[in-house]
UniProtKB/Swiss-Prot annotation:
Keywords: Acyltransferase, Cytoplasm, Transferase. Residues 244-265 are annotated as: Disordered. The lineage of its organism: Bacteria, Pseudomonadati, Pseudomonadota, Betaproteobacteria, Burkholderiales. GO terms for biological process: protein catabolic process. The gene is aat. GO terms for molecular function: leucyl-tRNA--protein transferase activity. Its EC number is 2.3.2.6. It catalyses: N-terminal L-lysyl-[protein] + L-leucyl-tRNA(Leu) = N-terminal L-leucyl-L-lysyl-[protein] + tRNA(Leu) + H(+); N-terminal L-arginyl-[protein] + L-leucyl-tRNA(Leu) = N-terminal L-leucyl-L-arginyl-[protein] + tRNA(Leu) + H(+); L-phenylalanyl-tRNA(Phe) + an N-terminal L-alpha-aminoacyl-[protein] = an N-terminal L-phenylalanyl-L-alpha-aminoacyl-[protein] + tRNA(Phe). HAMAP family: Leu_Phe_trans. Pfam families: Leu_Phe_trans. It comes from Methylibium petroleiphilum (strain ATCC BAA-1232 / LMG 22953 / PM1). This is Leucyl/phenylalanyl-tRNA--protein transferase.
Length: 265
């Protein structure tokens, strides 16, 4: 039975109390209270995250199974590999980290998505993650072409663990480029797992898979207390982590043609 948190001092419950698979709201473990950095840090360290709609109290979740992306298992399709090779070689194309976090989280909250009428990133959540970003725990990976932000993602870092939150794309493959950059950064910094929270076919096609809650929480216990990466700068040398030079040479079309093509509505 989910726990009602009446006060910011109320502790989050044991995740074993989360509603089970097959219930009306599987994974729901608690409701209520605040979104302070202290509360968020407590939650994420235990594999719990907030997710709710307008008009609802803050809802806290710990799904079982859990969708994760082992960075060693990231799948690069032939077309994405070609795009990344062109992108990484072009001086007017770059990945930036934390250059415009506010724009990234705003775009994640407002970009229309197929099959969704609204957003789960409520204004209170935007404010909470922005505050946590200022404290150094939340980061954005951003796809820039010719000085324009075309896609990106943001997520939480605790120790040697990264929790993906949301992504957006305003041009074909722009969010995939940001995700590939995150994977490369994680490989370079001994972060083995990216939390994806819940299953989607899109993430599954990129190598994400489900693990049970005990396995996920065991990984957190080993990683979140470690020293986090110190340098949150994306260097072009990070692309070598993806071994983009393998396979046939890409066709000669320009990066600008690929990266500035508008995304399908």
């Amino acid at each position: 039975m989910p726990t009602w948190l009446a006060s910011p001092d109320d502790p989050l419950p044991d995740t074993r109390h989360a509603l089970p698979a097959g219930s009306e709201v599987p994974g729901l473990v608690a409701a209520g209270t605040d979104l302070s950095p202290r509360r968020l840090a407590e939650a994420y360290a235990r594999g719990i995250f907030p997710w709710y709609s307008a008009g609802q109290p803050v809802l806290w979740w710990s799904p079982d199974p859990r969708m994760v992306l082992p960075v060693a298992e990231f799948k690069l399709s032939h077309s994405l590999r070609k795009t990344l090779r062109r992108f990484s070689a072009a001086p007017h194309c770059e990945v930036r980290i934390d250059h415009d976090f506010a724009a990234v989280i705003h775009a994640c909250a407002t970009t229309p998505r197929e099959g969704q009428d609204g957003t789960w990133i409520q204004p209170e959540l935007q404010a909470a993650y922005t505050e946590w970003h200022r404290l150094g725990a939340v980061h954005s990976f951003e796809t820039w072409v010719d000085g324009r932000l075309l896609g990106g993602l943001y997520g939480v870092n605790l120790g040697r663990m990264f929790f993906g939150e949301s992504m957006f794309s305003h041009a074909t493959d722009a969010s995939k480029i940001a995700l590939a950059a995150l994977v490369a950064f994680c490989r370079a910094n001994d972060i083995a797992l990216i939390d994806c929270q819940q299953r989607t076919a899109h993430l599954g096609s990129l190598g994400a898979r489900e693990i049970d809650r005990p396995a996920f929480e065991g990984h957190l216990a080993r990683t979140v207390a470690q020293r986090p990466p110190e340098d949150w700068t994306y260097h072009r040398s990070h692309w070598t982590q993806l071994r983009l030079d393998t396979g046939p040479d890409p066709a000669s079309s320009s990066v600008t043609e690929i990266s500035l093509r508008p995304a399908a509505p």
